[in-house]
Structure formats: structure tokens, C-alpha cells
């Protein structure tokens, strides 16, 4: 009615490597999904004041993208178990306020697949965004610290593409 487009900001769905990987998973190129992983590490050094950051920020603003990615890649399945551990490893002095800067989450889906999501607020080597889906017939990997390409591994071999680094992977999106 307002004539504007409204969209939730889950930008990985529009990044080329992630869309390519999702297509491979969804068209059955890697078979039945067994394991998924998604990793987000923000570039360091971490300079924000932990007192100004809500305690659950690592979950609500960082890992939320990993959760969306895992659910998108494992389309049609629902999480049935979730376990999380988080701590203030970068800023242990902020631990008592509830601030968490590092977290790992394990998810079991109703189709039997198991997923992990990992986040950190401080990767001194730069922005690091990666993912992987292991299936009964192959594997697809997305991103790495020096590349944003998708890599597909099957019995037929592997395919590798490389692209820009840092946030340039989202420029076309």
C-alpha cells in the first residue's frame, strides 16, 4: 500500500556464493543434508564499550544471520533441539554484566541434520564469514577469510570459484 519494498536484512541469501550453495543443496547435488555449519567473526580489534551493548547481542544481531542461513540451507526442516554456550573471551572484564563476545550453538533438526553456528566479535585477521553443508553425496562450502567463493565437492570432483574479500561479497546484492 505504501509503495515501498520492505525486507528483512538477511543479506547472505543474496550473496552469490551463498545463493550458489543453497541452489546446490536444494537441487540435491550433495544428497541428503546431514551436517551444516555457519560461522561469523567480526573484524577486530573489538573497541566497543561492552556496557553499551545488550547482553544477548551476539545472538540477536550476529548469530541471527547464521540461524537464518542454516534454516534456509536446510529448507523444510525445523529445529527440535538447541544448545548454546557463550562467554566473554575477548573482554572477560565485562563478563559480570552479562556481555558475551563469543558463542557456539548446536542445533538438531527434525530431519536428523545437525548444525553448528559460531560467532566472535573479534577476528584480528579480518571479517570472516563461512559455511558448509555436508550431504550424503557431497559437500558445499561457502566463503573463507581470503575468498567469498563457493566450493562444491561431489564424487565427480570439486569446483572452486573465488571472488572479492571483506564485505565486497554483498556489493552485487
What spans do the regions from the language model cover?
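A contiguous active-site-proximal alpha/beta segment in oxidoreductase catalytic domains
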Residues: 1-48, 56
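Structural detector of well-ordered beta-strand residues that form the stable sheet scaffold
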Residues: 5-7, 37, 83, 116, ...
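C-terminal glycine/acidic-rich active-site capping loop/insertion
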Residues: 11, 95, 109, 129-173
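A general structural signal for well-ordered alpha-helical segments in protein cores
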Residues: 17-18, 66-67, 173
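Alpha/beta-hydrolase-fold catalytic nucleophile elbow
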Residues: 39, 85, 134
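Rossmann-like dinucleotide-binding domain that binds NAD(P)(H)
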Residues: 46-114, 120-125
Amino acid at each position: 500500500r505504501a509503495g515501498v519494498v520492505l525486507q528483512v536484512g538477511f543479506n547472505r541469501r543474496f550473496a552469490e556464493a551463498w545463493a550458489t550453495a543453497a541452489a546446490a543443496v536444494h537441487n540435491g547435488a550433495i544428497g541428503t543434508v546431514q551436517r551444516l555449519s555457519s560461522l561469523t567473526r567480526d573484524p577486530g580489534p573489538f573497541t566497543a564499550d561492552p556496557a553499551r551493548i545488550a547482553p544477548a547481542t551476539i545472538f540477536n544481531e550476529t548469530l541471527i544471520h547464521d540461524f537464518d542461513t542454516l534454516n534456509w540451507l536446510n529448507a523444510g526442516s525445523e529445529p527440535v533441539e538447541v544448545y548454546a554456550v557463550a562467554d566473554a573471551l575477548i573482554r572477560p572484564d565485562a563478563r559480570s554484566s552479562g556481555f558475551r563476545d563469543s558463542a557456539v550453538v548446536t542445533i538438531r533438526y527434525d530431519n536428523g541434520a545437525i548444525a553448528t553456528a559460531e560467532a566472535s566479535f573479534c577476528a584480528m585477521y579480518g571479517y570472516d564469514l563461512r559455511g558448509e553443508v555436508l550431504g550424503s553425496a557431497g559437500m558445499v562450502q561457502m566463503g573463507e577469510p581470503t575468498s567469498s567463493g563457493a566450493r562444491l565437492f561431489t564424487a565427480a570432483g570439486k569446483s572452486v570459484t573465488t571472488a572479492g574479500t571483506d564485505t565486497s561479497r554483498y556489493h552485487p546484492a
